[in-house]
Amino acid sequence: MIALDQILSKIMQESGSDIYILPGTPVKAKVRGQMEQLGEERCSVQDCADLLQEIYALAGGRSMKRLEEVGDDDFSFSLAAVGRFRCSAYRQRGSYGAVLRAVPFSIPDAEKLHIPKAVMDLFSLKRGMVLVTGPAGSGK
């Protein structure tokens, strides 16, 4: 089974966005819009539970009580020199799974993101409201 720190480091190095930890399948990641397997080994129910325990430990020793009682939990955690992550953990059919969203420490500048000057000029407006909308993962 691939180690959690390797999973998290790999996703940040490859500019991935999401990590999927599900029993019965290898750990998967979304990288540049494409799903990739991280290793060949399928996660057993116990592997998923073990990875979740590690994730909760990284979240400052957060208790798994809510997950066990309610069946889901959402929280964030950081791994020094790697990045921040949001975690949606859940219980389904008696086993645990999780989806992690990578949140890089640094924010790229507008030029690197190819944001037009007209959009950047909106930041200087003194009145009104600017809505930025779009689907999850679209770069809002």
Predicted features along the sequence, with ranges:
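Conserved glycine(s) of the Walker
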Residues: G139
